[in-house]
Amino acid sequence: MNVTPWEVEGVIDYSKLIEEFGMQPFSEVLPEIDNPHILMRRGAIFGHRDYWRIIEAMQKKEPWAVMSGFMPSGLPHFGHKMTMDEIVWHQSAGGKAFVAIADMEAHSVRGLSWEKTRELGMLYIKSIIALGLREDAVIYFQSKSSHVKDLAFELSAEVNFSELRAIYGFNSDTSLAKMFVTAIQAADILHPQLSDFGGPKPVVVPVGADQDPHMRLTRDLAARISIFSFEPVEGGVRVRSRKGAEYLSSLRDLEFDKKIYEEHMDIFGEAEEIERAVRKIEVEIGGFAFIPPSSTYHRFTTGLTGGKMSSSKPESYISLLDPPEEGAKKVMKAFTGGRATAEEQRRLGGEPDRCVVFELYSFHLIDSDEELNQIEAECREGRLLCGKCKKMAAELVKSFLKEHQEKMEAVDLSNYTIIG
């Protein structure tokens, strides 16, 4: 198993990923979520970091945001749809939505022209709008966002080559552009907390597990670039300054009981209120006061031939732009969890856990749990053979693609603000 931001190889063991990457199982927070998305209920979203911040903000009706992006290296497909659905759901749950088109990454890492990245990027934008993204979303191309590029420059001062080499495996042959893209992506994630967008707030980033190195680096950078750090102490919070003890003097007028030391200040009271007050002062004196971003991790969408669905492997995916009949044909050729013969399938039953078609049902095509459970039971009991199952899925894919593409055609971009 090899999982990096640019390559996924081998059989993925998600429980092992949770352990290796230091995530938390999403099942632990699922009971706290009102009306969870089917991707949450059905286990497509398997891990998280600090999603409790988002749940608390939802429950208290406090500001929060959802942010994710798409590298326009090929046509949008069902793997991208998973992230799009998560963004749309979080927006409907009260989050401010930020959608990045990672044209700088596509240009520097994949070698696409700026013209091609824009052409493809607009297809991603129309697709997520067709899936329900509302007009109040912030949509932008990385190369055209001064907020992102300026913040990336600031963040790049906080990281060096040795660290990038350890995280990403960069070497002397790695281009400077590819290295700088890591700062751009960190800025994508953190810029919803800039003052121009309402200041510090919880932000959740729905991603695949291959993007976790970006999240770990970004969480570290959020702490490094902020002036104040927080540590729990009995009855309150210990506040330190990363930029010099003189900054602590700006906290002297806070209306909490406190003890002032040479290198830190202990402030007593409810931790959340203290941290909010300190962050407010940090912004007032010119700091960033970033809250470490939260993240959710979804399973990789299995390609039609096995392995990860990838824009760089056209044979592996159903594009959201495929002609409906073509999409249906691809389903009929997809890898399934069936047995070698129909007789063996009737006797032993199918294996939906290994089936690309059942995955399409679970994560994209069937909303009804009762209907999905019936298909699974009939498959396992050998009563539903792969040929019939594929035909059912092919019709659903054809219907979805037809409706989705009609919605894309009807998208009125004049109702949206697109930076770029």
From Swiss-Prot:
Gene3D superfamilies: HUPs, Tyrosyl-Transfer RNA Synthetase. Belongs to the class-I aminoacyl-tRNA synthetase family. InterPro entries: aa-tRNA-synth_Ic, Rossmann-like_a/b/a_fold, Trp-tRNA-ligase, Tryptophan-tRNA-ligase_arc. The keyword Transport does not apply. Its EC number is 6.1.1.2. It comes from the Archaea. CDD domains: TrpRS_core (cd00806). Its main location: cytoplasm. This is Tryptophan--tRNA ligase. It comes from Archaeoglobus fulgidus (strain ATCC 49558 / DSM 4304 / JCM 9628 / NBRC 100126 / VC-16). Keywords: Aminoacyl-tRNA synthetase, ATP-binding, Cytoplasm, Ligase, Nucleotide-binding, Protein biosynthesis. Pfam families: tRNA-synt_1b. One of its GO terms (biological process) is tryptophanyl-tRNA aminoacylation. It is found in: Cytoplasm. Signal peptide: none annotated. GO terms for cellular component: cytoplasm. The gene is trpS. A motif ('KMSKS' region) lies at residues 308-312. A motif ('HIGH' region) lies at residues 72-80. It catalyses: tRNA(Trp) + L-tryptophan + ATP = L-tryptophyl-tRNA(Trp) + AMP + diphosphate + H(+). GO terms for molecular function: ATP binding; tryptophan-tRNA ligase activity.
